A protein has these predicted regions:
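Aromatic- and glycine-rich beta-strand/loop motifs that create alpha-glucan
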Residues: 1-30
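Central hydrophobic cores of alpha-helical transmembrane segments
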Residues: 28-33, 203-217, 284-286
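Aromatic-anchored segments of alpha-helical transmembrane domains
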Residues: 32-40, 211-222, 237-240
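Secretory targeting signals
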Residues: 35-82, 105-198, 233-260
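Hydrophobic/aromatic residues in alpha-helical transmembrane segments
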Residues: 78, 89, 192, 269-270
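Transmembrane helix boundary and interhelical loop/hinge segments in multi-pass membrane proteins
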Residues: 79-96
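Junction motif at the cytosolic side of a transmembrane helix
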Residues: 195-199, 262-286
Length: 286
């Protein structure tokens, strides 16, 4: 195996082991409790009321499209990676052995590993905490509940899986788009935290990332046009579509381009920061 690749994978493996063994991972359990309370239980109550089975995949789509949970998930993930990249007494030695850019490439792989692991836990947790049948199509609990109980059409539970979603795209497409866009959202926030850590302003990086999440929450809640300038609106799939009309409000490809451009810019900024990284300042951030 190429030496550079070995160095990159070594960095990624080392960081990932530190990450999954960090006591902070217990906060994921708190997120699962919120998921069950805010999304899974309300959908199961509808299933019981209709006497029909819920699709066990639907709660994940609800979680990934709920304004409350799309706010909580990035916040939980930011808590988990807020200390990264690790700047300890061994960092100088580690970077000198691997090389700056091998070290950074390893950090990128680590981030993808941690994001995928995090989303897999959310997806698996939503399936295990739910009950019903497995199918690749939307269940009648989702598509017909509002017609049978019109007085509940504007309830919080209805907003979890609105008609903008199930009338416009298949369930599997909704799951894949939710996973892809949430992955991009978490990576973007991670790159912001990394950049400010690399220029030795760690606290501002976390503040900047939280501010972006907060701005997304506010603009999405008020349905302001400027919401498309923030990653949160671009992450919530149903916001892209009308309720009935097939024409999208904002094409989904816009959000993929948005994230691609934003991520490329942030990765380039991080590469510049790595190139200018001062080893003598490591002890100051330790």
């Amino acid at each position: 195996m190429n030496r550079n690749l070995k160095c990159v994978l070594s960095v990624a493996r080392s960081e990932y082991i530190k990450w999954i063994t960090n006591p902070r991972v217990i906060i994921v359990g708190v997120l699962l409790v919120f998921m069950r309370t805010l999304a899974i239980e309300p959908l199961l109550e509808r299933s019981a009321k209709m006497g029909m089975p819920l699709n066990i995949l639907e709660p994940f789509v609800a979680i990934g499209n709920s304004g409350m949970l799309v706010m909580l998930m990035p916040c939980v993930f930011m808590v988990l990676i807020s200390d990264y990249p690790k700047m300890t007494g061994n960092t100088l030695f580690f970077i000198q052995r691997t090389g700056r850019f091998n070290w950074f490439a390893g950090q990128i792989i680590f981030l993808f590993m941690s994001i995928i692991s995090f989303l897999c836990v959310v997806l698996t947790g939503s399936v295990l905490l739910s009950k019903g049948e497995f199918s690749t199509t939307w269940s009648d609990v989702v598509t017909k509940y509002s017609a049978r109980f019109p007085d509940e059409a504007n309830s919080f539970t209805s907003s979890l899986l609105p008609s903008n979603l199930y009338n416009q795209i298949p369930l599997i497409t909704a799951i894949l788009q939710t996973l892809a866009l949430m992955c991009a959202y978490l990576f973007l926030l991670s790159m912001i935290i990394y950049f400010f850590k690399l220029i030795h302003i760690q606290s501002f990086g976390l503040f900047a990332a939280i501010s972006i999440v907060a701005a997304g929450v506010v603009t999405c809640s008020l349905k302001m046009n400027i919401m498309w300038s923030f990653p949160m609106a671009n992450t919530i799939v149903w916001l892209h579509y009308e309720e009935i009309i097939g024409k999208p409000i904002v094409p989904i490809w816009y959000s993929y381009i948005y994230f691609c451009i934003a991520v490329i810019i942030l990765v380039l900024l991080n590469i510049i920061a790595v190139k200018r990284f001062q080893f003598t300042n490591i002890e100051q951030v330790e």
